[in-house]
Amino acid sequence: MNYTKPADLSGPDDPDNAHVFETELDTNAEQLAASHAATMEQVHKSEAVGALVRADGLYAGYFPGVNILNSSDLYAKDGELVGIIGPNGAGKSTLLKAIFGLVHINTGAVLLRDEDITNLRADQLVRRGVGFVPQTNNVFPSLTIEENMEMGAFQDPKNFSARFDKVVDLFPTLGERRKQRAGSLSGGERQMVAMGRALMMEPNVLLLDEPSAGLSPALQDEVFVRVREINQTGVTVIIVEQNARRCLQIVDRGYVLDQGKNAYTGTGKDLANDPKVIELYLGTLAQA
């Protein structure tokens, strides 16, 4: 049997044709990557149908025309706990802030039960059932714990006592120290106050930006337990975390962001066991 070598597949002794061959391989790889990305985008949009909150193709940043997010997608269904991990500067917090109307969205949309909420202010989103806890311990230090809770419910102060009781069910310490000034609390306790205050408006979805940041390992574990308990009350939670391994242990689904794009997505368990995710992200992020 005779074998004929294709004319365009030259050996290393023909550098010109070899360069053409390498260029074709690069082009084919780019086309395959683009096709895979397009397929994954369609799958994501199909899965996102009926989601409580959805971000579609977000290009967003802190200034008009300057993007930190580059076609980022995310969805969370009723009752889900969704995590966002990735290296520093990947756009994790920016994605959360884009959902809450705190950064400029240049292209794309944010939807809440299929209603476009892209251009709504933060206070309007709170009224629609979206809560947000920023990364810093956002408490009023000169106010008592109880007064901080009142600030959380100022838009709708009805039934304050009943709402506060629900918060105390999750964070018993807040009830025991309700008359104590927030400025005298530890970092972990302040984080509980911040989350409790966001819950006073009884949100349908709660956005948490690195709630374990700056806490000791023991307090981090407590925060993650509380986050899961909040979710188990029926609140949809989207959490950004630098402690990637711990985050993936509690979430239903996760997103890995890199350079403002979705690098990987899957269940928490699948991402935690994915060799590429482990190699590229979990090895360093687990220590952060």
PLM regions and their residue ranges:
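N-terminal acidic, proline/glycine-rich, low-complexity intrinsically disordered segments
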Residues: M1-F21
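Glycine-rich phosphate-binding loops of nucleotide-dependent enzymes
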Residues: Y3-P6, A29-A288
